[in-house]
């Protein structure tokens, strides 16, 4: 286990019905999701997670080399299981290991503005210089927009 991977896991707590902002990254930041088809594989996996009631997605953006995902964790699964399932499904479909180990998570506190967090997430393509308007980027969703 790499030194930073252990620090990613320290203090991690999974709580049902908690809203989380998760970020997971491709191995060596390879822009594998620049491919429309590959990006849609991630989106399909996120939707499946919702359909199985593991999560309730509030917002996401699939960037060329990472994913931001804001969701409410269901009561049947642990946070690490949900992330592992998403990563595994996409890896199997692509046919090769693509993910950096671990992920970053932030449990949203009651006093945090969830809509502003969603705006931050979906504005990622603008900040990265990929598009001028959010609507021009195809791989995002937010329940408020």
Regions found by a protein language model. Give the residues of each.
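Short catalytic/metal-binding and nucleic-acid-binding patches
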Residues: 1-145
């Amino acid at each position: 286990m790499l030194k930073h991977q252990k620090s990613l896991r320290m203090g991690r707590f999974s709580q049902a019905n908690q809203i989380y902002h998760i970020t997971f990254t491709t191995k060596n930041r390879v822009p594998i999701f620049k491919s429309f088809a590959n990006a849609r594989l991630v989106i399909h996996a996120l939707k499946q997670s919702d359909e199985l009631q593991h999560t309730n997605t509030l917002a996401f953006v699939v960037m060329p080399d990472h994913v931001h995902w804001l969701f409410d964790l269901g009561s049947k699964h642990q946070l690490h299981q949900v992330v592992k399932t998403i990563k595994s499904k996409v890896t199997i479909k692509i046919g090769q290991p693509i993910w950096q180990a671990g992920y970053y998570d932030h449990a949203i506190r009651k006093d945090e503005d969830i809509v502003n967090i969603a705006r931050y997430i979906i504005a990622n393509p603008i900040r990265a210089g990929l598009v001028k308007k959010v609507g021009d980027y195809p791989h995002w969703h937010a329940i408020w927009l």
